[in-house]
A protein has these predicted regions:
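Active-site lumenal/periplasmic loops and adjacent helix-entry segments of GT-C-fold
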Residues: 27-118
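Start-transfer (signal-anchor) and selected internal transmembrane alpha helices
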Residues: 1-31, 42
């Protein structure tokens, strides 16, 4: 009998976890569902621009990029002032989707990366 209760508790815990994941995904998709793949805020615009720079100019240029358009008038050395994992991930996903024949724009990928990342 104890094993049955343990199985029920685990099933309920798994169901609660699955529902929490579904709700978190739906919450992150809300803006995309309502307004489409549009970048709304400043930080996502910077991250999109940084990812675009990585895709267009490659690794070496990205890690030596001094961005004069941010932190005006001083600018900023991008590679030493950000965590580049999101940009690298978005660039890799964009390249993978294009290699598979799926024509996703970089902006679309950058809109969905936070949803997929949680």
């Amino acid at each position: 009998m104890l094993d049955a209760w343990l199985l029920i508790r685990r099933a309920l815990a798994l169901a609660a976890l699955a529902e929490a994941c579904r709700m978190a995904y739906a919450f992150r998709m809300h803006a995309i569902d309502d307004y489409g793949s549009v970048i709304h805020e400043f930080d996502p615009w910077f991250h999109f621009r940084a990812t675009e720079y990585l895709v267009q100019n490659g690794w070496h240029a990205f890690f030596h990029w001094f961005d004069h358009a941010s932190w005006y008038p001083l600018g900023r050395p991008v590679a030493t002032t950000i965590y580049p994992a999101m940009h690298i991930t978005a660039a890799a996903i964009h390249a993978s989707l294009n290699a598979c024949g799926l024509a996703w724009t970089l902006e679309d990928v950058c809109c969905f990366v936070p949803v997929w990342g949680g």
